[in-house]
């Protein structure tokens, strides 16, 4: 009898765990979609203010329902497939881009809970999948994103779309090298590939290590502009040259999926910047009353500040030429990133500040032992 009882309890446990996981996934997806909608609203409002305009102000109070009106407009538009295009690839491309933009959020920790285990405080991040190779997972997902763009440009049977796709692929591949090396400097200082552990380690570090990694934060931020095809590096979508780039032939929901994927990636890469360089869910200053505010609020506020910088740059800085973009990535950021990897390694070794033995941090994986 006990055998069947154990099978039943295991089955109920699996069902409950699956239900909790499904709820987490749906909560993250809905949050990202709503964030994308109001990021577009924020972008239009900020650019309007910089250009001395009002921005959206008709649909709903203060124009707050404008994103939903835009969504309805895209849904009811006619879906047109270009003549002589590869229809299957043409339809799959936006699905790939949108899906990969959401998959990256699986390892992003939004906050953390603190529990006591054998007299030690252990921090458990609030994340869908707390995997040991979270950083590698993020890099792999971001690298795969270029396939959706390449497929879209090739399958559209349009020279404008194909040139935009080639530009986007070369641009993303070029700046992923710099982004990867900047992340390596953080890994050298923290000693973990788990994003939650990186946040905890950065919080417990001395301030001089934060100053040492500050130039890499600048390189990461500028490279993220190029990685997400944002101004002033939006060469794949140069309206004056390529009309709209790789998505020029798309309309209705396929276009909306590209649009959602682009802005979801924009939020994701700023979430990565907050985790690697700006303290994650911890307050910006180590003051006791600031810890009353939940960590997820600090996490979101930091992302909003970086997104505002993205929008500000779009409204004020002119577009780079393509040769300037490539030169910046390969002749400036790549040498600086390589130099900083060596410099950080040497400084950590010389000052005996290598991770684990330097900070004495109780990490999440201790619960697994």
UniProtKB/Swiss-Prot annotation:
Keywords linked to the UniProt accession: Cell inner membrane, Cell membrane, Membrane, NAD, Quinone, Translocase, Transmembrane, Transmembrane helix, Ubiquinone
Kindly give the InterPro entries that the UniProt entry links to this protein.
Answer: NADH_UbQ_OxRdtase_su1/FPO (IPR001694), NADH_UbQ_OxRdtase_su1_CS (IPR018086)
Enzyme class at the top of the EC tree: translocase
Which GO molecular function annotation, any one, does this entry have? quinone binding
Q: Name one GO biological process term.
A: aerobic respiration
Its primary localisation, in coarse terms, equals membrane
Q: Name one GO cellular component term.
A: plasma membrane
Q: Does the keyword NAD apply?
A: yes
Name the membrane topology term.
Answer: Multi-pass membrane protein
Q: Which residues cross the membrane?
A: 20-40, 88-108, 133-153, 179-199, 205-225, 267-287, 293-313, 328-348
- Tell me which NCBIfam families the record gives: PRK06076.1-2, PRK06076.1-6
Briefly state the protein's biological role.
NDH-1 shuttles electrons from NADH, via FMN and iron-sulfur (Fe-S) centers, to quinones in the respiratory chain. The immediate electron acceptor for the enzyme in this species is believed to be ubiquinone. Couples the redox reaction to proton translocation (for every two electrons transferred, four hydrogen ions are translocated across the cytoplasmic membrane), and thus conserves the redox energy in a proton gradient. This subunit may bind ubiquinone.
Q: Give the protein family.
A: Belongs to the complex I subunit 1 family.
Tell me how this protein assembles. Answer: NDH-1 is composed of 14 different subunits. Subunits NuoA, H, J, K, L, M, N constitute the membrane sector of the complex.
PANTHER family xref list: NADH DEHYDROGENASE SUBUNIT 1, NADH-UBIQUINONE OXIDOREDUCTASE CHAIN 1
Q: What is this protein called?
A: NADH-quinone oxidoreductase subunit H
Species this protein is from: Ehrlichia canis (strain Jake)
């Amino acid at each position: 009898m006990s055998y069947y009882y154990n099978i039943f309890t295991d089955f109920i446990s699996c069902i409950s765990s699956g239900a909790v996981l499904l709820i987490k996934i749906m909560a993250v997806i809905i949050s990202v979609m709503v964030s994308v909608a109001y990021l577009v609203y924020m972008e239009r409002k900020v650019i309007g203010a910089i250009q001395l305009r009002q921005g959206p102000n008709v649909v709903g109070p203060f124009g707050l329902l404008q994103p939903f009106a835009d969504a309805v407009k895209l849904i009811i538009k006619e879906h047109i497939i270009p003549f002589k295009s590869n229809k299957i690839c043409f339809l799959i491309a936006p699905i790939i881009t949108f899906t990969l933009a959401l998959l990256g959020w699986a390892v992003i920790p939004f906050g953390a809970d603190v529990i006591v285990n054998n007299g030690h405080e252990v921090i458990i991040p609030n994340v869908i999948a707390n995997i040991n190779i979270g950083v590698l997972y993020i890099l792999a997902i971001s690298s795969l994103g270029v396939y959706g763009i390449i497929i879209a440009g090739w399958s559209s049977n349009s020279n404008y779309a194909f040139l935009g796709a080639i530009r986007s692929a070369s641009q993303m591949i070029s700046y992923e090298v710099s982004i990867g090396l900047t992340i390596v400097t953080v890994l050298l200082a923290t000693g973990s590939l788990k994003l939650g552990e990186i946040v905890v380690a950065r919080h417990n570090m001395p301030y001089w290590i934060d100053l040492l990694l500050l130039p890499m934060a600048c390189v990461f931020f500028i490279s993220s502009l190029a990685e997400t095809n944002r101004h002033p590096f939006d060469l794949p979508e140069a309206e004056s040259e390529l009309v709209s780039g790789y998505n020029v032939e798309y309309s209705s929901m396929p276009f909306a999926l590209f649009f959602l994927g682009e802005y979801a990636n924009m939020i994701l890469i700023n979430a990565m910047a907050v985790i690697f360089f700006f303290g994650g869910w911890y307050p910006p200053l180590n003051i006791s009353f600031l810890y009353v505010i939940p960590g997820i609020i600090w996490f979101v506020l930091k992302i909003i500040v970086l997104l505002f910088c993205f929008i500000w740059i779009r409204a004020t800085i002119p577009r780079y030429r393509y040769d300037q973009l490539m030169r910046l990535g390969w002749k400036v950021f790549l040498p600086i990133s390589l130099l900083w990897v060596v410099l950080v390694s040497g400084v950590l070794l010389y000052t005996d500040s290598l991770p684990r033995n330097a900070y004495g941090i109780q990490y999440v994986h201790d619960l697994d032992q």
